[in-house]
UniProtKB/Swiss-Prot annotation:
Gene: rrp42
Transmembrane segments annotated in the record for this chain: none
Subcellular location: Cytoplasm
The protein's name in its UniProt record: Exosome complex component Rrp42
GO terms, molecular function: mRNA 3'-UTR AU-rich region binding
Cited InterPro entries: ExoRNase_PH_dom1 (IPR001247), ExoRNase_PH_dom2 (IPR015847), ExoRNase_PH_dom2_sf (IPR036345), Exosome_comp_Rrp42_subfam (IPR050590), PNPase/RNase_PH_dom_sf (IPR027408), Ribosomal_Su5_D2-typ_SF (IPR020568), Rrp42_archaea (IPR020869)
Superkingdom in the source lineage: Archaea
Keyword Lyase: no
């Protein structure tokens, strides 16, 4: 066994022993989040943006909007696409190059939470049905990895969307010309989905795992809900299994914590 494996085993034993005593390595209770800070409109040239700090984790989310064609099977809907960049300076485990499986999973979970909750009214992004729609790009940049990138990124994405303003557009049906006006309107956001992530370590389940907890967790579960209680995304990670009663417990906590975080997001964007 290598020195690194020995240290990981010692850390796991220490964390599990603390959990048996009802404690976490950073002093939080099992259902406590780390300190959460949200700032919006932090990228001047983006249509919307947000910076999120969750404990030692930092993410920056920018929103860009372009005009383009709709998907052939959804001619009366605008388009949303989510991309994630794991900045190499954020973690020794991040490498430059194309997105790896972690970045792809992160982008998919964030995208699914927004898309399946119908957070953005895609019908209102249509300029000409079947021909011209707004294409919204959600770009997530992980600046510092201190654990629980899923929640930090999802919170940053919805905060950035809520801060987004789009230039009004005039379309001339006779000439087919498009005029971009110097007038702006808010992106139509109808729901505020919030992801809540749990780590299973031994027989204990904790919310918002730190990086130390992620390194020793047996399983991970992320549940995204909106203000109506609708579940828009769920993602399981790692090999460990969750019992049905553990999933139901996680759902109950996800709804409660989602409401608490949602209030902070709305306050940050001036909609509280």
């Amino acid at each position: 066994m290598s020195e690194m494996e020995v240290m990981a085993s010692i850390m796991r034993d220490h964390i599990i022993e603390l959990l048996r005593e009802g404690k976490r390595i950073d002093g939080r209770s099992f259902e406590d989040y780390r300190d959460l800070e949200i700032k919006v409109n932090v990228i001047e040239k983006a249509e919307g943006s947000a910076w999120v700090r969750l404990g030692d984790t930092q993410v920056l989310v920018g929103i860009k909007a372009e005009l383009g064609e709709p998907f052939p099977d959804l001619p009366d809907r605008g388009v949303i696409t989510t991309n994630v960049e794991l900045v190499p300076l954020a973690s020794p485990t991040f490498e430059p190059g194309p997105p790896d499986e972690n970045a792809i999973e992160l982008a998919r979970v964030v995208d699914r939470g927004i898309r399946e909750s119908q957070a953005v009214d895609l019908e209102k992004l249509v300029i000409v049905p079947g021909k011209l729609v707004r294409v919204i790009f959600i770009d997530v940049h992980v600046l510092d990895h201190g654990g629980n990138l899923l929640d930090a990124s999802g919170i940053g994405a919805i905060a950035a969307l809520l801060s987004t303003k789009l230039p009004k557009v005039n379309y001339n049906e006779e000439t087919g010309e498009v005029e971009i006006l110097d007038e702006y309107e808010p992106l139509p956001v109808n729901h505020v989905p919030i992801p809540v992530t749990f780590a299973k370590i031994g027989n204990s389940i904790v919310v918002d795992p730190s990086l130390d907890e992620e390194r020793v967790m047996d399983g991970r579960l992320t549940i995204t809900t909106d203000e109506t209680g609708h579940i828009s995304a769920a993602q399981k990670g790692e090999a460990g299994a969750f019992k049905m009663e553990e999933v139901m417990y996680a759902l109950e906590v996800a709804l409660k914590k989602g409401n608490e975080i949602r209030e902070k997001v709305l306050k940050a964007v001036g909609r509280a």
